[in-house]
A protein has these predicted regions:
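Active-site loop immediately N-terminal to the catalytic Tyr-X3-Lys motif
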Residues: 32-36
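Active-site-adjacent segment of SDR/Rossmann-fold oxidoreductases
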Residues: 12, 30, 51-62, 72
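A transmembrane-helix-recognition feature enriched in membrane-embedded lipid enzymes
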Residues: 113-145
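Catalytic tyrosine of NAD(P)H-dependent dehydrogenase/reductases that use a Tyr as the general acid/base
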Residues: 38, 46
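Active-site helix of classical SDR
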Residues: 6, 41
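SDR active-site lid
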Residues: 58-121, 154
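Residue(s) in the substrate-gating loop at a strand-loop-helix junction
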Residues: 25
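A short helix-coil junction within the Rossmann-fold of NAD(P)-dependent oxidoreductases
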Residues: 8-17
Length: 161
């Protein structure tokens, strides 16, 4: 796990130096129906990174949480089940960020000693808006986003398509 890996490497990093870059997500800032575990896990990654950053700064170890939105990698398409057509939020691709932008912005943020980075202009703007929007408004919109279609309770997983 991320926690074990970080704690296993920290003693050596204190002696020899190094940096930690953890991959979080813009989703860490949101309550996401049908993706609650994902959002909560990414919030954990961000919080762990922030705490480690404070703990390790006296040792010269920089810690960065990278919080991208959707990244243009092709992974999403490859990971879908055959015939899967649902659960694509309208306009989602408008927020895609290139891998190159994520890497460039992340390395720049690390060199500047930042705690978090939201790579790409659109994701930075989204993060800014989320930071000033009332939580009730965020809940309202997230509660109305397209949802997964789940099989009926009496359907077996093998009969659901």
């Amino acid at each position: 796990s991320l926690t074990r890996l970080c704690h296993a490497l920290i003693p050596s990093m204190k002696r020899n130096g190094g940096d930690i870059i953890n991959l979080s997500s813009l989703g860490a800032l949101l309550p996401i129906p049908d993706f609650a575990v994902y959002a909560a896990t990414k919030a954990y990654v961000s919080s762990l990174s922030e705490a480690l950053r404070l703990e390790l700064r006296e040792h010269g170890i920089r810690v960065l949480a990278v919080c991208p939105g959707p990244v243009s990698t092709g992974f999403g398409k490859a990971a879908r089940r055959p015939g899967f057509t649902g659960n694509m939020m309208p306009g989602r691709n408008a927020f895609d960020t290139s891998v190159e932008t994520v890497v460039k912005d992340s390395l720049r943020a690390l060199s500047r000693g930042r705690a978090r980075v939201f790579p790409g202009m659109k994701i930075r703007l989204a993060a800014l808006l989320l930071s000033i929007a009332p939580l009730g408004l965020i809940r309202f919109f997230m509660g109305r986003r397209p949802r997964k279609v789940l099989p009926a309770p009496n359907d077996s997983p093998s009969s659901a398509s």
